Amino acid sequence: MKNNLPVKSRLLYKRLLSYVKPFWPVLLLGILANILYSGIDAGFTYMTKLFLDKSFITIDLDFVRKIPLIVLIGITLRGIVSSLGSYCMTWVARSVVKVLRQIVFSHIIHLPADYYDEATSGQLLSKILYDVEQVAQVSADALTDFIQNICLVIGLLTVMMVICWQLSLMFLLTIPFVGIIVNYTNKRVRRISHKVQKTMGEVTEIASEAIEGYRVVRIFGGENYEVTKFNKATEYSRKNDMKVAVSKAINVSGVQLVIAIGIAMIIMAAIHLSTVIIISAGSFLAIIAAMLQLIKPMKTLTTLNATIQRGLAGAESVFNLLDLPLEQDKGTILKEKVKGEIEFQHVFYAYRQGQTVLHDVNFVIEAGTSVALVGHSGSGKTTIASLLPRFYELSQGVITLDGVPIQQLSLESLREQMSLVSQNVTLFNDTLANNIAYGRFEASREQIITAGKLAYADEFISQLPDGYDTRVGENGVLLSGGQRQRIAIARAILKDAPILILDEATSALDSESEHYIQAALEQVMKGRTTLIIAHRLSTIKHAHKIIVMQHGRMVEQGSHQELLGIDGHYAQLYKVQQFGKINEEVIA
């Protein structure tokens, strides 16, 4: 493990630099500016020797008169290259962050559906926002400080060697001890930084859930619970941050102590070996000045280590995400529009954990007909609907579309044939028109309005002040449940796909909303192959075929009347729902 850490760090650096490579001209300019900045600082230290020797020991009036001009030019040039270097390095950093965020977001969008089942939105947002931002500190802030300070250290050591190499060598004896201290804190900070990455994901997740579910939080009195949970997460984050701070403090204090010992050794050597080592007063003071100047860059370099380790931990988190395999798309067949005949042949499906949730499922949906899946929660209905657009990949068996296995169709072509209307409608914080036209961005306003009318959405949209240009808020929060459903149906109508998946599209709606939704669904189902998932059996009476699922297996199939005649599982479900409906009417 100890031997792998430097190798792992080098690999991370190498991979990170591949994202910096496109911006190398600006990076090179920034590096040169920072080198020049450090060179000017080291030059000023050497000027101390010349100033003292030529002003007080061997007086050189010509040189003394030039000192103000030299200082003015040096400071002006130092300011220019400092600003140039800072601008260039920041430009590179923000460019890298922009590119990385775009790549990470694009990668997340194309990950398999089962990854979303396991990951939380808070963790994903933390990677896009926090982890990528840590990379910026490595690619700009840390790199700038590293170049400036390492060049200054080299420059000052060079000045010391030029002035008196004997004393300088004594100071260099302290360098291995600095390396030992830095190596110790390096490992500790990296380990803690991984915990910081994780806790930031947890903090984001808790906050995101509480904000999105604020109605549930308030109605069930969960405010104090959420605040306590958030406080615990932030306290854990604070403790990890403090561990990093302690490591940095040990690092800085240890390095400063080593440098102080080095300075003391040189002063003692200069005093006791004055007969052997002969230097001028200016040279001696210049060496002392150089050593004192070394404290700041050495301190910065040691604290910089913690920043670099945090950045590398962030980079590692980002790269681990980017290394996850994308949704597999080996299909090569492209179809403009299918008839819509679907067949499930001996279909099995198991989750990654090995739990089989579908067992030998076989059925056919004729083109242009409707099939409803019913059964208790967890019976496999939604899994079947998820297999059709290949959100999940089959464990065994074949699903065909117009006789072609869906694995042979390209994902884009396959999903182009389908529309989805689900219980949990997804609307974007945009206008109603853009939400209806989602995926059909080239649609005209007339086409959007026509879809709205067919979905019985135009009547409430036309009453809004901005009509179809009304923004709906985050996830359509400004609309009622029934209104959101009608927008989703309008979106499906506009897409005009030959296959329609209705996943609990009318559940949890009031009677008036359900009336509108049913009327809208009749419009969108015309001439389309429709797969319906429903709990309310009253909504699927007219389906051409009803399939009853239980524990991942098909137990019955037939029309509504046929299944009632069998007096099996479906009939039992229907009687229970009818009895509940009668009770509701009596109570009302």
Give the location of each predicted region.
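An intracellular "coupling" helix at the cytosolic face of ABC transporter transmembrane type-1 domains
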Residues: 25, 113-114, 130-139, 143, ...
